[in-house]
Amino acid sequence: MESWLFLLLIALIAFVAKNQSLLIASVVVLALKALPNSAKIMSWLSDKGINLGVTIISITILVPIATGQIGLKDLIQSFKTPMGWLGILCGILVAVLSSKGVGLINQSPEITVALVFGTILGVVFLKGIAAGPIIASGMMYVIITTFQAFQH
């Protein structure tokens, strides 16, 4: 019963905060929880959900390449500017940090609770987004802003 109330509370907070992604996620999890054999579905999502999410984000990132909005010349151009190099470095850093983070979660599963709670707080109250590659652009923003502040 506690999990139902917790999920409903998250859905309510998401609704009040007008966070559509978290609202949809909590309603979907509530709906899945109501299904017979939900333990199997939840177990599968728990095991494969991050990979599924990363796959969907990767597809989204590749769409501009497929539509021709981004081409090989754009990739080459990214190596010619400091912003391009910074973007590449931030992407590498996020990939490495993510792999270390997954290792930490596997070693200390109790960290997951704090991460989930922190993510919910960030998404709801700070208008954040629970997404991995987006973090790279956020890190890039911080680095660029810091760099620009020291230039003036």
From Swiss-Prot:
It is a multi-pass membrane protein. Keywords: Cell membrane, Membrane, Transmembrane, Transmembrane helix. The keyword Cell membrane applies. The keyword Membrane applies. It is found in: Cell membrane. Belongs to the UPF0756 family. This is UPF0756 membrane protein EF_1246. It comes from Enterococcus faecalis (strain ATCC 700802 / V583).
